[in-house]
Amino acid sequence: MSIQIPRGTQDILPGTVELWQYIEGQAREICRRYNYKEIRTPIFEHTELFLRGVGDTTDIVQKEMYSFQDRGERSLTLRPEGTAPVVRSYVENKMFGDATQPTKLYYIGQMFRYERPQAGRYRQFVQFGIEAIGSNDPAIDAEVIALAVEFYRGMGLKNIKVVLNSLGDAASRQAHRDALIAHFEPRIGEFCSDCQSRLEKNPLRILDCKKDRNHELMGTAPSITEYLNEDSAVYYDKVQELLTMMDVPFEKDPNLVRGLDYYQHTVFEIMSEAEGFGAITTLSGGGRYNGLVQEIGGPEMPGIGFAMSIERLIMALKAENIELPLEHSIDCYVVALGEKAKDHAAKVAFDLRKAGLSVEKDYLDRKMKAQFKSADRLKAKFVAVLGEDELDKGIINLKDMATGEQEEVALDVFASYVAEKLI
């Protein structure tokens, strides 16, 4: 019996990897333009980090984490999200002492959640995320959202929308929390067991419930906008004003809460409106987390960030029929004819690669026709033919596969000649 891939994971094969590499390259490029620096954290962390950083009332912590005991009886967890590890690194490495605040970081990496696999949702998945830590300026909120929107636009997506809300500061959240408890408590028995347990711990999460979203009490629940104090309302208005100035359209949704406990003030999601995208329309989401650095052991430092699923981005690209400019060709294929030419062909391929070109050659002693077929499949720009006649003359026959033109090139200058033609 053959061993198969675990459920909820996928192999990304040659031919598809190039798409991922292109997306990751574009992510790095936009982060360069916004002056975000890459950070790489461990794939596993101490479980306590996520209990404190994500929140013990969240679905992630209660149902979805891959946790295990190591041989030293330490509880470790494969990271289910990227913000808490980045903040842990920020605190542990004392980045808050850097004079150039805010600290602007990005990551591209694999995350792990035990969820029911479906289209766009895997148990191992890749996130691109950014974190800006150290500023309470609404301009950084707008910048984070604008970066995400510009990235999607740069990928060619047109059918996207930004959904925006504010959860307010700690005082606003507490006032809203009390109102939600008073609203739901008399009829909480009509809700699912998850919502019943959330009532006292984090009633805001009831608004995020998928099972009870059509319950009549959901439509009449107190809105956070009714409980924003003056400072929170001014902050929210400023974020909206800046987004409008940046030509970033958005919709306000007072029921948007996000699934993590650390959010305050700005929260947002970016969704696909493309036909055929599927039921899960959220491409990315994020928000402000002003208490998280302190919760993880650092000084009182505000922060904001977002994370996006690369898998869902690829779904959106397919839904909008977007073809990205991927490079699937090689520069040169070396055809060797006869035993005498084989070793020399290996040297020619080596010299071409040394000159910076992508090169392939035959390793199966096939006839010339079969070797040319391989060159076609690999979309070679040039084919170099080396046989005994060419060796005797000290030349190589070079064919331009786009024009069909052929020429003879001296063997001792061949690599530099082909390199010049391709530059």
From Swiss-Prot:
Report the catalytic activity.
Answer: tRNA(His) + L-histidine + ATP = L-histidyl-tRNA(His) + AMP + diphosphate + H(+)
Q: Which InterPro entries match?
A: aa-tRNA-synth_II, aa-tRNA-synth_II/BPL/LPL, Anticodon-bd, Anticodon-bd_dom_sf, His-tRNA-ligase, HisRS-like_core, HisRS/HisZ, HisRS_anticodon
Its keywords, alphabetically, are:
Aminoacyl-tRNA synthetase, ATP-binding, Cytoplasm, Ligase, Nucleotide-binding, Protein biosynthesis
Annotated GO CC locations: cytoplasm
Q: What's the domain of life for this entry? A: Bacteria
Q: Which PANTHER family does this chain map to?
A: HISTIDINE--TRNA LIGASE, MITOCHONDRIAL-RELATED, HISTIDYL-TRNA SYNTHETASE
Protein known as: Histidine--tRNA ligase 2
